[in-house]
Amino acid sequence: VRAGDTVVVVGAGGIGMNAIQGARIAGALAIVAVDPVNFKREQASGFGATHTAASMDEAWSLVSDMTRGKLADVCILTTDVAEGSYTAEALALVGKRGRVVVTAIGHPDESSISGSLLEMTLYEKQIRGALYGSSNAPHDIPRLVELYSAGLLKLDELVTREYSLDQINEGYQDMRSGRNIRGLVRF
């Protein structure tokens, strides 16, 4: 992500919120958080999202209007499980030389992704995978500590609910239903 970019983050869980923060820290001009769960969309602005959408279709209309048809520079897929069909929607959200970054893990049996190869070539769009943000721990961790210490990186705010060990099943239910960004079990 570069300063001035329009960024779409699909999936506003823990990884998505950190992608939103990364885009904010990198200087993105507009950051759209896409998630069907209202609670997560509401939380996203606190991490740096400038806009939210409940679906990819809603995000496309919003981004198209915001950019006067130019579309996003980057779309980051941070959904819990990636499906091959998500790439077509993500590619449709980015404009010329747009980049799609996939952080979500796909199902082992799913071996194909979808999208227009013609559009990908004509508009020089890119798709890439990223594991752990493609980080370099010896370089990145000291920088992240500096950002956290300066109040620019929100980590404590990611924990939206704490559970006792007796509440572990409730914690799993909340995780599955999207009622948390991150839950913490204290024992």
Regions found by a protein language model. Give the residues of each.
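Mid-domain Rossmann-like dinucleotide-binding core that forms the NAD(H)/NADP(H) cofactor-binding site
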Residues: 1-57
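C-terminal hydrophobic helical "lid"/dimerization subdomain
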Residues: 57, 88-92, 96, 134-187
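Short amphipathic alpha-helix with an adjacent loop that forms part of the alpha/beta core around
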Residues: 59-69
